[in-house]
């Protein structure tokens, strides 16, 4: 019989891909959304690892005073892969 800890590990954490995509989309469209999201979220809050990486890159661009758009985001993500 599984222990409580084993049952906990097997359980999938609640998440919503749609909500995660909506947050990222809002951040692309509105710099104020970046400020709001940064105040309450970290990359670890995203269930989808890749969404957390995108979130982190967007916040970094914002902190660097750069435009946050598809081109700068793509370049930042490529830079982070190196």
Predicted regions and their residues:
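Noncatalytic partner-interaction/assembly domains of nucleic-acid and motor enzyme complexes
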Residues: 1-82
């Amino acid at each position: 019989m599984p222990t409580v800890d084993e049952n906990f590990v097997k359980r999938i954490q609640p998440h919503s891909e749609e909500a995660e995509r909506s947050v990222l989309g809002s951040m692309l469209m509105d710099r104020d959304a970046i400020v709001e999201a940064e105040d309450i979220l970290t990359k670890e809050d995203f269930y989808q690892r890749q969404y957390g990486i995108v979130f982190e890159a967007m916040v970094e661009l914002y902190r660097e005073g750069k435009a946050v758009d598809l081109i700068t985001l793509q370049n930042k993500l490529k830079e982070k892969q190196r």
